[in-house]
């Protein structure tokens, strides 16, 4: 809902150059004059000395001002993996506690909302907890709500809106900030369209795709070229981002070729003609979750596991009798080849291919670590099949479970548990031990929250995959039967649950359990970020937004 703006046109302030923006322009000018950075014909980077010039700019930046704005620009452009060491040093130089105490005792004037909200967001993103109470300074004490004078500060409102998406449970002030900033940004659109089309587009894009819940992999390309952003450092780093985009694009094409050949060689597409045959779509999950180019082998391996989630889902959803599904689930629970003898050949082929994939992943870890995750991986797949079987039995008996029961099972049948356990193993970080793997295997909240987001988004439109026919349950159906509400009531409840799940996921990523290495946390977030794109069907049951992104990336 848009609010009317009471201030006059003259007093309405869009983005305007600040001292920090002027500073960024000076740095860009000096950098361009001294650098010969360019793209070679083969798309590779020029010598290391040119890349080092970017690193040098980061190292010399004031960590409390320029440094944070540079980090924001680098993250938006999707090249933060290049500067992990420099970014970590800037972030670690910050003190969340000191930041809060200094701000709390500043009684003389409001600090710039843009800077405060940016710092809040970046520190939280990197695991430094900053209390949301810092935003109390921007509230009208007499009215108990945000100061309406802030509605003229478009730059600050954008930063506040971005920061609000790192909310955790109980932070009502960030819920208020999200509503306040969104309302006034929406209200600004008409005026912005009159005299600043670029900024109007930027505001609209931010409202639709806040940074914390978006994938820079899909949005970075929109920043290429002359882009009058509130962050002038985007112009500084975009040349490097273009080079990286071309390099990584070639890498992704090579990985898709490997995945496609593997999929063809195992023969499941021929054996299971009823199942989905979409290796490129399955690869997108891996590409989104594991963004660092160095993780090429892991992306290919992860796509293999994801392909089986889709195929086995189709076996349970569309093809087999209930008796066959029970036998298949028993086979996956025991991992005894004798258990598949009474199954159709197609299901036998699927079981063997799944077992080979799991053994391959386990053997790689065994060679490196001297112990095997085989038991944990097998147990995870057994849990998935058991959840699929529960849904198959519900359908066969025409039983509609209560909404809570459906969602608890749906968290497992979403496949997120399988994906994240495989990611945890494939990353092979120093934190990977049998003890930490057991912890991840037992569905910690970082997994259940991510899985809830996927399950609810999947059910939101009750849409089928564009090439899928068959039967599935739906949270909407369960909610309406149990509580007698309308479709709109059910969907409103689902959106509230998605919001709650995001708050739980934020908490896990901000407070950081030592068992979870940063790449695993990032993969969990990225999985949740991709979900809306994967389930945003049009009236033709297609995914136009996802297809558009795939074309631009590949």
From Swiss-Prot:
**Catalytic reaction annotation:** (2E,6E)-farnesyl diphosphate + H2O = (6E)-nerolidol + diphosphate; (2E)-geranyl diphosphate + H2O = (S)-linalool + diphosphate
Which residue numbers does the motif DDXXD motif cover? 313-317
Q: What pathway, per the record?
A: Secondary metabolite biosynthesis; terpenoid biosynthesis
Gene3D superfamilies membership: Farnesyl Diphosphate Synthase, Terpene synthase, N-terminal domain
Q: How is its cofactor bound, per UniProt?
A: Binds 3 Mg(2+) or Mn(2+) ions per subunit.
**So where does Mg(2+) 2 get bound?**
313, 317
Pfam families with a match to the protein in the record? Terpene_synth (PF01397), Terpene_synth_C (PF03936)
Q: In which tissues is it expressed?
A: Highly expressed in glandular trichomes.
Gene Ontology BP annotations: diterpenoid biosynthetic process
The prosthetic group or cofactor this protein requires is: Mg(2+); Mn(2+)
The protein's Enzyme Commission number = 4.2.3.-, 4.2.3.25
- The residues that the entry says bind (2E,6E)-farnesyl diphosphate are 276, 313, 317, 455, 458
Query: What does the entry list as the binding residues for Mg(2+) 1?
Result: 313, 317
Membrane-spanning intervals of the chain: none
GO molecular function terms noted in the UniProt entry: magnesium ion binding; terpene synthase activity
Record has Magnesium as a keyword: yes
Q: Sum up the protein's function in the record's words.
A: Involved in sesquiterpene olefins biosynthesis, constituants of cannabinoids and terpenoids-rich resins. Catalyzes primarily the conversion of (2E)-farnesyl diphosphate to (E)-nerolidol, and the conversion of (2E)-geranyl diphosphate to (+)linalool.
Annotated family: Belongs to the terpene synthase family. Tpsb subfamily.
What information about domains appears in the record's comments? The Asp-Asp-Xaa-Xaa-Asp/Glu (DDXXD/E) motif is important for the catalytic activity, presumably through binding to Mg(2+).
Could you tell me what this protein is called? Answer: (E)-nerolidol synthase TPS18VF
Q: Which gene encodes it?
A: TPS18VF
């Amino acid at each position: 809902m848009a609010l009317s703006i009471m201030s006059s046109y003259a007093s309405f302030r869009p983005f305007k150059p600040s001292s920090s923006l002027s500073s960024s322009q000076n740095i860009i000018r000096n950098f361009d004059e001294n650098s010969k950075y360019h793209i070679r014909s083969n798309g590779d980077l020029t010598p290391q000395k040119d890349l080092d010039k970017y690193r040098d700019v980061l190292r010399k930046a004031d960590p409390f001002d320029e440094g944070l704005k540079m980090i924001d620009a680098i993250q938006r452009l999707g090249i933060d993996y290049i500067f992990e060491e420099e970014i970590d040093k800037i972030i670690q130089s910050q003190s969340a506690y000191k930041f809060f105490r200094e701000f709390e005792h500043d009684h003389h004037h409001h600090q710039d909302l843009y800077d405060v909200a940016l710092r809040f967001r970046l520190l939280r993103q990197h695991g430094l907890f900053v209390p949301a109470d810092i935003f109390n300074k921007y509230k009208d004490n007499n009215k108990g709500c945000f100061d309406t004078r802030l509605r003229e500060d478009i730059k600050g409102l954008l930063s506040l809106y971005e920061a609000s998406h790192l909310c955790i449970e109980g932070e009502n002030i960030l819920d208020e900030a999200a509503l306040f900033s969104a309302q006034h940004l929406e209200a600004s659109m008409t005026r912005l369209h009159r005299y600043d089309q670029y900024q109007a587009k930027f505001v609209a894009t931010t409202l639709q795709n806040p940074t914390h819940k978006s994938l820079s992999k899909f949005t970075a390309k929109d920043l290429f070229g002359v882009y009058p952003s509130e962050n002038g450092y985007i112009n500084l780093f975009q040349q490097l981002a273009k080079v990286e985009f071309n390099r990584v694009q070639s890498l992704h094409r090579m990985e898709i070729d490997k995945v496609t050949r593997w999929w063809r060689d195992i023969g499941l597409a021929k054996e299971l003609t009823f199942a989905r045959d979409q290796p490129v779509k399955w690869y997108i999950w891996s590409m989104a979750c594991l963004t660092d180019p160095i993780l090429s082998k892991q992306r290919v391996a992860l796509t293999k596991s994801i392909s089986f989630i889709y195929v086995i889902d189709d076996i349970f959803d569309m093809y087999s009798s209930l008796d066959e599904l029970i036998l298949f689930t028993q086979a996956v629970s025991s991992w005894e080849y004798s258990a598949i003898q009474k199954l159709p050949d197609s299901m036998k082929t699927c079981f063997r291919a799944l077992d080979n994939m799991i053994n391959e992943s386990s053997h790689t870890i065994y060679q490196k670590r001297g112990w095997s995750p085989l038991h944990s991986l097998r147990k995870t797949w057994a849990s998935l099949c058991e959840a699929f079987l529960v849904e198959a039995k519900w359908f066969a008996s025409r039983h509609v479970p209560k909404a809570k029961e459906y969602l608890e099972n749906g968290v497992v049948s979403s496949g997120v548990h399988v994906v994240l356990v495989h990611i945890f193993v494939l990353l092979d970080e120093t934190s990977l031990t049998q003890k930490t793997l057991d912890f991840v295997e037992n569905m910690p909240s970082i997994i259940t929250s991510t899985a809830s987001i996927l399950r609810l988004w999947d059910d939101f439109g009750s849409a089928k995959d564009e090439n899928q026919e068959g039967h599935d349950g739906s949270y909407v159906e369960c909610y309406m039967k149990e509580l007698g509400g309308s479709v709109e009531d059910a969907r409103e409840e689902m959106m509230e649950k998605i919001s709650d799940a995001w708050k739980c996921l934020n908490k896990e990523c901000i407070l950081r359990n030592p068992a979870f290495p940063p790449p695993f946390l990032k993969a969990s977030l990225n999985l949740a970020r991709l979900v809306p794109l994967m389930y945003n069907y049009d009236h033709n049951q297609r995914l136009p937004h996802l297809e558009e992104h795939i074309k631009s990336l590949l």
